[in-house]
């Protein structure tokens, strides 16, 4: 099978859909890999690395004109025009974008949106949401530390004491947990809020403090349990109380 890995063209996008290691594995299975020139440069992967792994370095038209195309982001109109009808597309395709899905269908593509992969043990290797959220949580704290005008940890020196930065994390999913862990390693004091009571233990295990908002009705408690690890919309009455508690922490946060 011809497998294409084109250069991502979305503004600010630096990722690439496959690494040389992936190319090597697919090559060993008998596939022919075509990588667009400079596809991995923004991700610090050279064309030479792909060539060494067994890929052919080609132009955009040849990379997009394969039987299977691997992309990070959904193709734009110009890219769709270069893809052949009947080809397969795998990537993060934003399955909630109905117009975008219609364009893919109109182009005759069989598309697989990796965001829709179930969160099960067997599908863990395809869980792009968790892997990218992990990176986002880490980078969010690193970026915050870069913009913050003081230190994150408490420092005691002969010149005086610098208090630790106080951070509030909203949402304790994969990104939130990584943000808490990263901020804690940098020495910050963290408080976190989430609608699900089950994450309180996770927050505390990472050294953070959970912002507890008690449930006053059975409806609130049922909604907070979530489904399949995902939170559900909470009743307005609970959201009002959460807003009050979070506002107190935000006012004192750095």
Predicted regions and their residues:
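Short beta->alpha connector loops at strand-helix junctions that form conserved
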Residues: 37, 60-61, 92-93, 114-118, ...
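Glycine-rich phosphate/diphosphate-binding loop of Rossmann-like nucleotide-binding domains
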Residues: 6-45, 153-249
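Short gly/ser/thr-rich secondary-structure transition/capping motifs
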Residues: 52-57, 71-73, 149-153, 236-241
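Small/polar-residue-rich loop-to-helix segments that shape phosphate-bearing ligand pockets
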Residues: 115-141, 147, 209-237, 251
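Glycine/serine-rich phosphate-binding loop and adjoining beta1-alpha1 elements at the start
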Residues: 2, 8, 77-166
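Residue-level detector of alpha-helix initiation sites
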Residues: 74, 135, 173-174
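An N-terminal-biased, well-structured beta-alpha scaffold segment characteristic
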Residues: 2-103, 107
């Amino acid at each position: 099978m011809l497998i294409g890995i084109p250069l991502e063209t979305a503004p600010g996008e630096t990722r690439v859909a496959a690494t040389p290691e992936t190319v090597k594995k697919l090559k060993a299975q008998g596939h022919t890999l075509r990588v667009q020139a400079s596809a991995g440069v923004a991700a610090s992967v050279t064309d030479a690395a792909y060539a060494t792994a067994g890929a052919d370095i080609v132009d955009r038209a040849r990379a997009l004109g394969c039987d299977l195309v691997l992309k990070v982001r959904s193709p734009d109109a110009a890219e769709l025009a270069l893809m052949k009808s009947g080809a397969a597309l795998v990537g993060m395709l934003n399955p909630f974008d109905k117009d975008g899905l219609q364009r893919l269908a109109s182009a005759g593509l069989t598309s697989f949106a990796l965001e829709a992969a179930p969160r099960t043990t067997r599908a863990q290797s395809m869980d792009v949401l968790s892997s990218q959220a992990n990176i986002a949580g880490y980078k969010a704290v690193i970026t915050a530390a870069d913009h913050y005008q003081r230190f994150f940890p408490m420092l005691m020196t002969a010149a005086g004491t610098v208090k630790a930065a106080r951070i509030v994390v909203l949402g304790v999913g994969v990104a939130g947990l990584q943000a808490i862990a990263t901020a804690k390693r940098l020495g910050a004091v963290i408080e976190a809020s989430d609608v699900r009571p089950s994450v309180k233990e996770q927050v505390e295990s990472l050294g953070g403090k959970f912002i507890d908002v008690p449930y006053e009705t059975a409806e609130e408690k049922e909604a907070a349990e979530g489904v399949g690890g995902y939170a559900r919309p909470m009743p307005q009455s609970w959201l009002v109380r959460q807003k009050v508690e979070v506002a107190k922490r935000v006012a004192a946060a750095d």
